């Protein structure tokens, strides 16, 4: 089974503030949907709750939500107690790929288990960010493909580039 991280990060590895994204990038969201559709997705409870209610659970995907709260339940998701538990659930499913979609502690716990990442590098810094992608994430990776370069336009406040990278 392929375990893949998909994340958008700022220049200083910023990924969020106050349980929300720091940007609205429709073409990045479109890429996210295209890549994850039909696969399993692993996320922490806060990431799940940050998804607008009308979009959750994410349609046409196995939603695996990690929470240490045994009483936390959501319709349409499979609950996991830990990142390793979430991986076991994904491995025992019929899905051939699992995407790790956040948040920071989930990325941190699973970054050594992945073989590929789709990283959206947002061409901006966000001093008010309070959530960050793991430090040194770029160690032991090779850029395989530059997938998309988006310039600033009426729908995109920030330029960004999406890369496919592989772990060595």
Task: Locate each region found by the language model.
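Enzymes that bind and transform nitrogen-containing heteroaromatic metabolites
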Residues: 1-168
């Amino acid at each position: 089974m392929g375990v893949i991280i998909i994340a958008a990060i700022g220049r200083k590895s910023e990924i969020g503030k106050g349980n929300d994204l720091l940007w609205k990038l429709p073409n990045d969201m479109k890429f996210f949907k295209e890549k994850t559709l039909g696969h399993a997705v692993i996320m922490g409870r806060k990431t799940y709750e940050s998804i607008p209610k009308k979009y959750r659970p994410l349609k046409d995907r196995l939603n695996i939500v990690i929470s240490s709260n045994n009483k936390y339940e959501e319709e349409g998701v499979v609950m996991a107690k830990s990142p390793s538990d979430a991986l076991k659930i994904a491995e025992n499913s019929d899905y051939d790929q699992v995407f790790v979609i956040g948040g920071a502690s989930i990325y941190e716990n699973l970054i050594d288990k992945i073989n590929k990442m789709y990283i959206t590098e947002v061409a901006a810094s966000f001093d008010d960010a309070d959530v960050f992608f793991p430090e040194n994430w770029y160690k032991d990776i090779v850029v395989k493909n530059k997938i998309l370069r988006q310039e600033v336009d009426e729908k995109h406040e920030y330029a960004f580039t999406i890369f496919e990278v592989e772990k060595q």
